[in-house]
Amino acid sequence: VTSNADRICTGITSSNSPHVVKTATQGEVNVTGVIPLTTTPTKSHFANLKGTQTRGKLCPNCLNCTDMDVALGRPKCMGTIPSAKVSILHEVKPVTSGCFPIMHDRTKIRQLPNLLRGYENIRLSTRNVINAETAPGGPYTVGTSGSCPNVTNGKGFFETMAWAVPKNKNKTATNPLTVEVPYICTKGEDQITVWGFHSDDETLMVILYGDSKPQKFTSSANGVTTHYVSQIGGFPNQTEDEGLKQSGRIVVDYIVQKPGKTGTIVYQRGVLLPQKVWCASGRSKVIKGSLPLIGEADCLHEKYGGLNKSKPYYTGEHAKAIGNCPIWVKTPLKLANGTKYRPPAKLLKERGFFGAIAGFLEGGWEGMIAGWHGYTSHGAHGVAVAADLKSTQEAINKITKNLNSLSELEVKNLQRLSGAMDELHNEILELDEKVDDLRADTISSQIELAVLLSNEGIINSEDEHLLALERKLKKMLGPSAVEIGNGCFETKHKCNQTCLDRIAAGTFNAGEFSLPTFDSLNITAASLNDDGLDNHTILLYYSTAASSLAVTLMIAIFIVYMVSRDNVSCSICL
């Protein structure tokens, strides 16, 4: 056989590989490309959540008013609360009301603005829930105070409560009295009813109520009952933010009445009876933040503010977030987006013991810039390289599938967190930080493992792609080439760049490249001389010679073995 044949091999690209990915079983692996899955955000201002109504202050048009002012119905802070799916808890320190001094620490009243923020739709009723003047223990005069001025700077009081001061002939001590609080909101709305009581020093208690002893109060709604006893005297003169200083104090609380449910208030003298009530429906997610809200963002994060999502995950400081947010992970994650790094392949010059060409060393092919997998030919023309775009696209599709799977995992975890947020207690709408951190650690570990397994699968699938290419190449070449191992074939014709490109495109025709211009193989058939021997005789000679040689070798090996064990001695005489 005489040949000027070329060699065609399947292979994977070889290029600089500065990237490293982590896998489940192989540890860190160098690859030709990666897709970063994480980002580390920087702090920014808070923003409106894209595509979502975002509420900053409860009443944006109520100037110089705190959310507590709005929640209690301070006369100068009456306005419309806009609907919102997201609310910003922007008041980070205990907030007072610019009205009559309140004993905030006696009740859960500080939570009232938070409670209202947790609703999508909030409105103040147009009518009073109780006629305060004719309530049990009356008749009453509805009291006002100069420390709580109205819009004309006259004396006023909170719109949500009526200060029930007994009329002159009725200023006497009384046993506990009961008033029912009816449900007056529209079906489907929660009713938030604000009430309270006033106390002062002994002298003023007698003047106002005809009784200087501590008074008892109880509220009950939805199976929750709360008891209070008023404190008499001992208060320094003060006001909340403005107005006249007061020696007295008020204690304010609220009850939440579910649709159709009636509440109950048991009271003595100094009661602040409910008046206008809050009617609220829907859910609004609450997150701690700051004002003003500038622009829009995909995500609102308690630590980083408004974020625009560029990666599915983030590293850095973990905190609560709402919106289309990346999920927190402990370490940076990268998905393999290429092939495992291989050094440039080299052709073995040596032949094996039986004369077969061993093929190419394991490695990658340089110059395969149009794809990851493909073919290379070596011959007089030099080196030709062609990428198999179909195989490369299949590999890319696998990576895309892995990326989509990771995104689905992200969405499921996000929905899990979102579901937890929706189930929070109405009053505070916050997760316990320790539980939240534990959940975040667990999710981070799940995501990290998913990425490790994805990288493992992407890298391991390279062998599948190469095997598929080898089968494809073998089928196309057919009898025009001889398989020599390691994905390589020795052709019976020349295969330059044009030939290789057609192989990569799947349009190769062996007959076209077997023309004389390609220096096809010149094979001279061996002939048998007619010496009067037939084929059977020739085969007999060959088999006899081979058998004799085998027997001779076996005897020689046996003698050498026996001599080495001193079982046979050999003397040579001259």
Curated annotation (Swiss-Prot):
Residues annotated as transmembrane: 543-563
GO MF, one annotated term: host cell surface receptor binding
SUPFAM superfamilies hit by this protein: Influenza hemagglutinin (stalk), Viral protein domain
Post-translational modification: Palmitoylated.
Lipid linkage positions (S-palmitoyl cysteine): 570, 573
Pfam assignment, any one: Hemagglutinin
InterPro entries assigned to the protein according to its UniProt record, in alphabetical order: Capsid_hemagglutn (IPR008980), Hemagglutn_HA1_a/b_dom_sf (IPR013828), Hemagglutn_influenz_A/B (IPR001364), Hemagglutn_influenz_B (IPR000386)
Cytoplasmic-side segments: 564-574
Glycosylation, residue list: 30, 64, 150, 170, 237, 308, 337, 496, 522, 535
Function: Binds to sialic acid-containing receptors on the cell surface, bringing about the attachment of the virus particle to the cell. Plays a major role in the determination of host range restriction and virulence. Class I viral fusion protein. Responsible for penetration of the virus into the cell cytoplasm by mediating the fusion of the membrane of the endocytosed virus particle with the endosomal membrane. Low pH in endosomes induce an irreversible conformational change in HA2, releasing the fusion hydrophobic peptide. Several trimers are required to form a competent fusion pore.
Miscellaneous notes: Major glycoprotein, comprises over 80% of the envelope proteins present in virus particle. The extent of infection into host organism is determined by HA. Influenza viruses bud from the apical surface of polarized epithelial cells (e.g. bronchial epithelial cells) into lumen of lungs and are therefore usually pneumotropic. The reason is that HA is cleaved by tryptase clara which is restricted to lungs. However, HAs of H5 and H7 pantropic avian viruses subtypes can be cleaved by furin and subtilisin-type enzymes, allowing the virus to grow in other organs than lungs.
Record family assignment: Belongs to the influenza viruses hemagglutinin family.
Protein name: Hemagglutinin
Organism: Influenza B virus (strain B/Maryland/1959)
